[in-house]
Amino acid sequence: NDIPFVSRSFGFATAVEEAREVLRCAHVESKGNPNGIGLVRLMGRSAGFVCASATLASGDVNFCLVPEADFDLKAFLISLEKRMDKRGHAVIALAEGLASKVMEPSGFDPSGNPKYGDVGPNLKARIEEHFKSVSKQVSVKYFDPSYSVRSVPANSEDSIFCWNLSRQAVYGAMAGYTEFCVGHWHGYFTFVPIKMM
């Protein structure tokens, strides 16, 4: 989560669960094609929490690319080539924030944040170019589950978490607090002043 003073927000567990399913599909697809590569772009403009957590949950991902880690495209392509030579398939999970490492901004949004194009097709093209340059054929299947990950009903864990958040909001209001957000920090529900966020 990239919200200050909030270690967990609602929807995270559901997003990870749905993303894991897409990674599973990418794994099946990559194994079902000769020299198959499943490339999955997951949400995370500035943070790779969903991508990293779904990677851990799936157990099928070979490369997890997040904006928090240094990224060297050439070194990645060499590692991917070695993986393909050895195993004949690979699954790559990448957070959309990786765009800041491999692309130039196309402008700025109203808040002043740099705007980047879609990193998924960009990386897919670079992978295909690399393998073509070394005379090796690969079949890259690109998955962009953005809306399917965002548009599902909350799972049981998130439903219970939201119920607890709402209960805490009522307790805070009844205690006379205003202009606060209910957060979750180190296992405890907290009241965070909105001006601190």
Language-model region placement:
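Short beta-strand elements at the ligand-binding edges of bilobed clamshell
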Residues: 5-14, 153-156
